[in-house]
């Protein structure tokens, strides 16, 4: 699991490669489960966490946009 956090200026993209990827945000969409080949965009300053959304293994590819990287922890 990637714990609750946000980025000040960087957009995150997550691509599900295997299994089911769970993307939780504190924005309007809240809780999404991605199947293989699905993607999810998280804009800057949006608190989010990433975890396995199914019973089996999960693989995903995180990509981050251009900008200074930071990892700002958020209370659960």
Question: Regions from the language model: what does each represent?
Answer:
Residues 7-8, 34, 53-55:
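Short glycine/proline-enriched turns and hinge-like loops at secondary-structure junctions
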Residues 30, 49-76:
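Double-stranded beta-helix
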């Amino acid at each position: 699991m990637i714990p609750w956090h946000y980025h000040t200026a960087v957009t995150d993209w997550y691509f599900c490669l295997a299994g089911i990827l769970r993307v939780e945000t504190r924005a309007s969409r809240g809780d999404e489960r991605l199947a293989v080949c699905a993607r999810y965009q998280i804009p800057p300053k949006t608190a989010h966490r990433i975890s396995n959304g199914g019973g089996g293994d999960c693989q995903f590819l995180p990509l981050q946009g251009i900008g200074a990287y930071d990892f700002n922890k958020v209370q659960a």
